[in-house]
Amino acid sequence: MATVPLGQGLLLAAILFALGLVGVLVRRNLLFMLMSLEVMLNAAGVAFIVAGARWASPDGQIMFILVLTLAAAEVSVGLALILLMHRRIPTLDADAGDGLRG
């Protein structure tokens, strides 16, 4: 069974993580920031999968399942917070939340 070389797989994970980080830092829309965070979490999952495949261990796949469940919880809480903020301020701009109290 052919696997992806460790260096190339980790390079792919680093590129995905960098794209997600740029998305979080550059975008001001809360939904795009949340999607960029998801890309970053998936990049970490890819790194776990590649490392697990390199040493023929199922631990990488187990950690990827953990990352997926963490991402699902993060999305549900994040979307709930975005909806609550959108009800108070009818915009998705991250800078608009500076005026909120409480």
From Swiss-Prot:
GO molecular function: NADH:ubiquinone reductase (non-electrogenic) activity; quinone binding
Entry's transmembrane regions: 6-26, 30-50, 64-84
Positions of disulphide bridges: none
Substrates-to-products reaction catalysed: a quinone + NADH + 5 H(+)(in) = a quinol + NAD(+) + 4 H(+)(out)
Gene Ontology CC: NADH dehydrogenase complex; plasma membrane
GO biological process: ATP synthesis coupled electron transport
Subcellular location: Cell inner membrane
Membrane-topology descriptor: Multi-pass membrane protein
InterPro entries documented for this protein: NADH_UbQ_OxRdtase_chain4L/K (IPR001133), NUOK/Mnh_C1-like (IPR039428)
Coiled-coil regions listed in the entry: none
Record bears the keyword Transmembrane: yes
UniProtKB keywords: Cell inner membrane, Cell membrane, Membrane, NAD, Quinone, Translocase, Transmembrane, Transmembrane helix, Transport, Ubiquinone
Primary site of residence: membrane
Top-level enzyme category: translocase
EC number: 7.1.1.-
Record-linked PANTHER family: NADH-UBIQUINONE OXIDOREDUCTASE CHAIN 4L, NADH-UBIQUINONE OXIDOREDUCTASE SUBUNIT ND4L
Protein family per UniProt: Belongs to the complex I subunit 4L family.
Known function: NDH-1 shuttles electrons from NADH, via FMN and iron-sulfur (Fe-S) centers, to quinones in the respiratory chain. The immediate electron acceptor for the enzyme in this species is believed to be ubiquinone. Couples the redox reaction to proton translocation (for every two electrons transferred, four hydrogen ions are translocated across the cytoplasmic membrane), and thus conserves the redox energy in a proton gradient.
SUBUNIT field: NDH-1 is composed of 14 different subunits. Subunits NuoA, H, J, K, L, M, N constitute the membrane sector of the complex.
Name this polypeptide is given: NADH-quinone oxidoreductase subunit K
Biological source species: Acidiphilium cryptum (strain JF-5)
